[in-house]
């Protein structure tokens, strides 16, 4: 975890970026998957935030995909696409606050991890123009709230035992609140050597009592929830943060996930769970604390055997005092559960409930028209309402409008008060249009069929026949939760292979084969059980599959059994020649290997990949046999003779993903797309002359996050077109402007 250091303000404008050696304007668009595709929850945090002063203003924050702003048509606009390789952790939005006094101001606590996975400290992003541009204050470490009576004051609750911090200048600088000494003791797994689960959760939330008196212009009463289990976890200051005490009489069994203040009632509502979220939760409670009589009341909406979850997302209806909602964390079967009360928690109604015959009465319709893959044909999953619900909000100006985040999308609707009628027939809609929070692992652009197919984390992947509409369904037969790699046969492009990453069920073959361009699939029968992941390559003529997995490199020809390939390590990069069906390639260290017998055996060529120790990607030309490129940690290398000799691309000192696309002129050199460092600039580049000259194609508004995570593919049918996959912002298509 990061040690505390001096707090230094550090400013970055979205419009500033290091100039590339040369640049070409590109038009970038999202390839629509729709529905979000990722977690919009909250660990112990709120993830969908409405502004209480400006009607219709709301933001959503995601764990790996940055920040979005709500539009009037229910769609969302991304606000942090500028994040580049140096600022990739800006996409980890750990907290968000929208100013209740000056709505144009918005603040984000950004950072990915507190262990070694993210070597950077956190930062506060601050905007005074609704997120169009940002300035940055670097933090020594990461929960964020704005004083409703003095909006220059911000409080920030940190992780890792770093305590409570305060700003009095709109977030430009922060100082530690030394009087707040309880920084949270809960650790998910102290034995986790990676540091991911062995860090202190820290401060969970900060909530102001907007009805309290002022001290020096600041709100006097402030509540802070801390990740303590078995001891006091809710603390209060009655003197604008000068001193703090534990709120007397509070429950101490569980962790406080959300703290929401209802001004009209002068009541603090708190949701609790026995786990930190977002996946866990087996017990929990909901309590309220009355300012008037300093009394805590247990208002948990489930008891006994009906209580098999904790509680996460929590919201109040500011238009209807006493109306609140809370989400189960987690009810995995048959569906997520949400509770609603109109009498301050005295009684509750449910989103669904069991009937006398053991079936389920659902009091909602399910509309996934904006993301039909959430409910594909033949869907038998009982989970319609979602899972992992940490972010739950009712629009403060509209009692019918509500939103909540799940592990896959944002749900909500515009008829919430129908819940309170005898019919209870609300419509639950996927309302995440514009949110593209997928982690993309593989992209291919075959020479025929759909221009793009994707391999995606958590939701499998898709055939993208239309970039403007959401796919009807993810891959099936089999459906893999995550697709780490794909390939197509260069001479028979309708033949496509993909792999899954979970070999725990040996009966599910982790290679799938399509012979109709991804329209239908079948498990590849020779695939051995228990193996998964790695990299995959299919021969140009489609009859041979080369698979690198944890057992090394194996090959199957004509649907025969997989056999080991000698001479290659399980670290080898692999690929097929896209024209010559007998040839496969491999690279390991600074050596390049070629097979001319359908992958049965490989021999190292005499050519060297310079001082490379880690080849990343091999890409072969769809139009020329033996024309192959290799990206490495020490540069980019090109061969036109099956790897017998290589030429190092000029000025390229490191390269990650590469892809080849249609040539500028018919019969000319393939366009080469590279995620690389060229002349000291790290970015996204294209060369039309075999790497002799380059143009940078990404710009200050499109950074695409961490370069090491992102696959790239040129389009062999459209000159200049490139597809970029990101780790949290989905897929982008780029064309010359």
Task: Show which residues each predicted segment covers.
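Extracellular glycan-interacting surfaces
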Residues: 11-14, 18-737
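Classical eukaryotic N-terminal signal peptides for Sec-dependent ER targeting/secretion
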Residues: 1-9
């Amino acid at each position: 975890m990061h040690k505390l250091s001096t707090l230094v303000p550090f400013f970055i404008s979205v419009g500033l970026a290091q100039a590339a050696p040369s640049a070409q304007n590109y038009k970038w668009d999202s390839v629509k998957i729709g529905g979000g595709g990722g977690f919009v929850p909250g660990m112990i945090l709120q993830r969908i935030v409405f502004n209480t002063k400006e009607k219709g203003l709301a933001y959503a924050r995601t764990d790996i995909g940055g920040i979005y702003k709500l539009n009037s048509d229910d769609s969302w606009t991304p606000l942090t696409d500028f994040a580049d390789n140096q600022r990739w952790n800006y996409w980890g939005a750990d907290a968000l606050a929208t100013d209740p006094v000056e709505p144009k101001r918005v603040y984000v606590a950004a950072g990915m991890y507190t262990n070694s996975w993210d070597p950077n400290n956190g930062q506060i992003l601050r905007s005074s123009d609704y997120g169009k541009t940002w300035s940055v204050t670097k933090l020594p470490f990461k929960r964020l709230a704005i004083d409703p009576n003095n909006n220059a004051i911000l409080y920030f609750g940190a992780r890792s035992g770093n305590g409570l911090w305060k700003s009095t200048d709109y977030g430009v600088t922060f100082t530690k609140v030394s009087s707040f000494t309880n920084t949270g003791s809960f650790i998910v797994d102290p034995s986790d050597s990676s540091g991911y689960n062995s860090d202190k959760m820290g401060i969970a939330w900060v909530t102001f009592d907007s009805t309290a008196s002022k001290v020096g212009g600041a709100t006097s009463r402030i509540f802070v929830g801390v990740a303590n289990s078995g001891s006091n976890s809710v603390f209060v200051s009655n003197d604008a943060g000068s001193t703090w005490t534990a709120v007397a009489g509070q429950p101490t069994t569980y962790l406080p996930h959300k703290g929401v203040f209802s001004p009209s009632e002068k009541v603090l509502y708190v949701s609790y769970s026995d786990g930190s979220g977002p996946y866990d939760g087996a017990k929990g409670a909901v309590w309220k604390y009355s300012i008037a009589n300093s009394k805590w009341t247990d208002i948990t909406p489930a008891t006994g055997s009906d209580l098999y979850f904790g509680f996460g997302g929590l919201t109040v209806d500011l238009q209807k005092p006493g109306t609140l909602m809370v989400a189960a964390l987690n009810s995995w079967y048959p569906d997520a559960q949400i509770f609603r009360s109109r009498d301050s928690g005295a009684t509750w109604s449910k989103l669904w409930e069991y009937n006398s015959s053991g079936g389920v009465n659902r009091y909602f319709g399910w509309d996934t028209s904006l993301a039909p893959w959430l409910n594909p044909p033949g869907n038998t999953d009982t989970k319609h309402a979602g899972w992992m619900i940490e972010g739950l909000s009712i629009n403060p100006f509209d009692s019918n409008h509500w939103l909540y985040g799940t592990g896959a999308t944002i749900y909500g609707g515009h008829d919430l008060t129908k819940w309170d009628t005898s019919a209870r027939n609300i419509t639950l809609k996927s309302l995440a249009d514009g949110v593209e929070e997928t982690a993309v692992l593989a992209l291919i652009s075959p020479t025929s069929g759909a221009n793009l197919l994707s391999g995606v984390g958590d939701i499998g992947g898709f055939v993208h026949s239309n970039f403007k509409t959401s796919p009807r369904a993810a891959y099936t037969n089999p459906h893999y939760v995550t697709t780490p790699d794909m390939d197509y046969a260069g001479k028979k492009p309708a033949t496509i292979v993909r792999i899954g990453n979970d070999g725990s069920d040996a009966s599910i073959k982790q290679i799938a084969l399509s012979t109709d361009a991804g329209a239908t699939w079948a498990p590849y029968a020779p695939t051995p059980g228990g193996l998964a992941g790695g990299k995959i390559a299919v021969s140009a003529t489609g009859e041979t599959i080369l698979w690198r997995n944890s057992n090394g490199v194996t090959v199957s020809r004509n649907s025969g059994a997989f056999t080991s390939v000698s001479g290659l390590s399980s670290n080898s990069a692999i690929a097929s020649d896209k024209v010559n069906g007998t040839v496969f390639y491999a690279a390991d260290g600074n050596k390049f290997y070629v097979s001319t017998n359908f992958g049965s055996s490989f021999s190292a060529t005499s050519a060297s990949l310079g001082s490379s120790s880690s080849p990343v990607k091999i890409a072969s030309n769809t139009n020329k046999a033996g024309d192959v490129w290799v990206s490495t940690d020490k540069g980019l290398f090109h061969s036109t003779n099956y790897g017998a000799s290589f030429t190092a691309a000029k000025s390229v000192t490191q390269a990650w993903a590469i892809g080849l696309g249609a040539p500028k002129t018919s019969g000319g050199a393939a366009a080469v797309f590279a995620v690389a460092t060229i002349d000291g600039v790290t970015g996204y580049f294209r060369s039309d002359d075999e790497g002799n000259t380059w143009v940078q194609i990404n710009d200050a508004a499109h950074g695409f996050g961490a370069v090491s995570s992102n696959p790239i593919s040129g389009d062999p049918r459209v000159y200049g077109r490139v597809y970029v996959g990101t780790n949290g912002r989905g897929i982008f298509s780029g064309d010359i402007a």
